[in-house]
Amino acid sequence: MTSPRRALVLVDVQLQYFSGPLEIHHPPHADSLPRITATIDAAEAAGIPIAVVQHSSGDQAPVFNPTMPEFALHPDVEARRRPEWKAITKRFSSVFAETQLLAWLRAADVDTVTFVGYMTNNCIIASAVAAEELGIDVEVLSDATGAINLANSAGFASAKTVHSTLMALLQSNLAAVAASGDWAAAVEAGQPLPKDNLPTSAVAGVARSARQAGQ
């Protein structure tokens, strides 16, 4: 089995997500942030290259405004930042859209990106989808990402529902999903994370639905 050539991508671990209407609620950022920093430490120890991404909506925007304090990285991430990290500022949901990330990954001979950060329901899912056509394998760490509560004209979904649903969706086709501790063990062993696929997920979904209907 070929060992993945990984890069860790820190997606928008910005202060914008730690208070206000965009505050991460599941997993709570009090839980996910320590998992993010532990993953950074594990990547550094293993010599895995790191890219740090910040979202900007422009200096007239009410959120993700680079002139406002909330644009900054969380201090626990900023304190670990090293000059060799690749710094990316994006304006679209995907970390690949109109950024230098792909070129940096190619130059480093990376074939697998590990995503941690926020939000599961926007930039993580968008980036995982974009990676497919680029031929980049994706890992998403379920306890080092997070979602918000959502309500709009189409309905309501709690952050827990959003996050757990998207983890199952990602694992079914677009990514290998795991907890940060399992990822660290896979890194140490030089192994890829296990990944399911759409047909087996569909078969298992039918069986699970039938069992629940029979209860």
Residue ranges and their predicted role:
Residues 43-58:
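Von Willebrand factor
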